[in-house]
A protein has these predicted regions:
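Rossmann-fold NAD(P)-binding glycine/threonine-rich loop
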Residues: 1-14
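An accessory alpha-helical subdomain
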Residues: 16-83
Length: 83
């Protein structure tokens, strides 16, 4: 089954081996995706080039997901300033 949250798509399949297991895993993974995921992905899309330029894209996205929200300009500046 597919899990879709905004631009995030996760697919779970057992190749027909055990659809019940796939359904169970799908539910667990869906419940593990934080509520702010769609907002973080949209924010990451809008700031991707700037963050890539400073080589902090992964660090900034990791921080945003840990907070379950997009980073503020101040938080981005702090990450870029710590280079």
């Amino acid at each position: 089954g597919l899990i879709t949250k905004g631009d995030l798509t996760v697919s779970i399949s057992t190749g027909g081996t055990c659809p019940a297991a796939a359904a169970c895993l799908r539910e667990r993974i869906e419940n593990a995706i934080p509520d702010g995921t769609e907002d973080v992905l949209e924010w990451a899309h809008q700031n991707r080039e700037r963050l890539k330029k400073h080589r902090v894209l992964k660090q900034a996205v990791t921080k945003a997901f840990s907070l379950n929200r997009p980073l503020t300009e101040e938080e981005i500046g702090a990450i870029i300033g710590n280079l």
